[in-house]
Amino acid sequence: VFIEFCVEDSKDVNVNFEKSKLTFSCLGGSDNFKHLNEIDLFNNIDPNESKHKRTDRSILCCLRKGESGQAWPRLTKERAKLNWLSVDFNNWKDWEDDSDEDMSNFDRFSEMMNNMGGDDDVDLPEVDGADDDSPDSDDEKMPDLE
């Protein structure tokens, strides 16, 4: 289970994994606003196998389920809709596809996050018409409005 706390410029990050609870706290932003979240999880996790990683824009947590292959219908024990919690469907994975590769993906995921900036050594392919001398359809005169 992946959880991302979107806090820019976080300091004093503390993530505590317990068997059925996750506690997160930090100071964030230029005003050092104190963030605190305590989540009673739907089911148990393995605190020793769960990890977190701080980036400039967020804190990424990877929770290892206590029993692999067991579906969680939601993240929290309570059924109430929490306004601060949303699903990232770009990273959605059906529980039926759950496998042991999940934690190894966390290492690759954090590596990907570290490499999201530009890389000056990357050779980009040539794009036809991308040079400054080529005529552009935006340069054509617009018809008068009637």
Curated annotation (Swiss-Prot):
It is found in: Cytoplasm. One of its GO terms (biological process) is telomere maintenance via telomerase. The keyword rRNA-binding does not apply. It is an enzyme of class 5 (isomerase). One of its GO terms (cellular component) is nucleus. Pathway: Lipid metabolism; prostaglandin biosynthesis. Residues 110-146 are annotated as: Disordered. Keywords: Cytoplasm, Fatty acid biosynthesis, Fatty acid metabolism, Isomerase, Lipid biosynthesis, Lipid metabolism, Prostaglandin biosynthesis, Prostaglandin metabolism. It catalyses: prostaglandin H2 = prostaglandin E2. Pfam families: CS. Residues 118-139 have a biased composition (Acidic residues). Residues 1-76 form the CS domain. Its EC number is 5.3.99.3. The keyword Lipid biosynthesis applies. One of its GO terms (molecular function) is Hsp90 protein binding. PANTHER family: PROSTAGLANDIN E SYNTHASE 3, TELOMERASE-BINDING PROTEIN P23 HSP90 CO-CHAPERONE. Binds to telomerase. Binds to the progesterone receptor. Belongs to the p23/wos2 family. Molecular chaperone. This is Prostaglandin E synthase 3. It comes from Gallus gallus. The gene is PTGES3.
